[in-house]
């Protein structure tokens, strides 16, 4: 649906060349809500603005429905852009226009008949819950209401793609939650593909199906939201995950490590969905006659799927511990031995 192929974007400032996007490859499937997260200056805004050619790539291709927008002539490009809606961090509403006229603007630009405009705008204002604000002006609205109007305007031309540029970063937590709920509703009821950028991992957790992490113009990690949260690989990704889910060693585990008992090993296992840690622990007891103690367990929820980390220790003679370690190395749950602040493969 949306595809970036080896996209690079450079800017020139005096004698300096700044690379905002560096050989980016990204694929967003039809119907997905795909989040891109990164710190300030990571290249997120340039990426999303490249999706509808607000920024033209220096090299590479951006494809929407298999079409490279950069190859289209002016009239064809205008038509293609009607299929791409966009909402902004600071709403970008016309202050001198009423709510009705703001939502109607894209339709007026395409010379849609007045009766059709009224029908569509009325429908959209009802959808975003602001039917009673049609004659109001933006200055009379709250931040959340302004963003709802921005969303209605972005949907006016019945797009298949919605681009969200930090759509909730100017909003308070409760309003953010309501806007995210509305975006999820749009995705489900209108089957609109959503590409959103944010610096808030809580937004990714709330509604995204997949996520890409950007740093210095590159995608450094990507995958399903569940896989990224449960097993971040890059240090930057781990920072984002840690901002809402602690990943450090629990106090009891640290205390156990400090005791440095020779016949004791400590492991961490990540469990997701239906994965059964109880079978793992039971097999250790039954197969090796080994003493197993759960030191700490945490559970979290990602869009209805639970995942967590369990820390357990094994006590036995060195030969038995060695056999158990070999067993754990081949186990599907891939437990990791905890040594100090490090986790190493079992």
UniProtKB/Swiss-Prot annotation:
One annotated GO molecular function: ABC-type D-methionine transporter activity
Keyword ATP-binding: yes
Family matches, as CDD domains: ABC_MetN_methionine_transporter
EC number: 7.4.2.11
Domain ABC transporter: 2-241
SUPFAM superfamilies per the UniProt record, alphabetical: ACT-like, P-loop containing nucleoside triphosphate hydrolases
Catalytic activity: L-methionine(out) + ATP + H2O = L-methionine(in) + ADP + phosphate + H(+); D-methionine(out) + ATP + H2O = D-methionine(in) + ADP + phosphate + H(+)
Binding site for ATP: 38-45
Signal peptide: none
Family: Belongs to the ABC transporter superfamily. Methionine importer (TC 3.A.1.24) family.
Annotated function: Part of the ABC transporter complex MetNIQ involved in methionine import. Responsible for energy coupling to the transport system.
Protein name from the UniProt record: Methionine import ATP-binding protein MetN 1
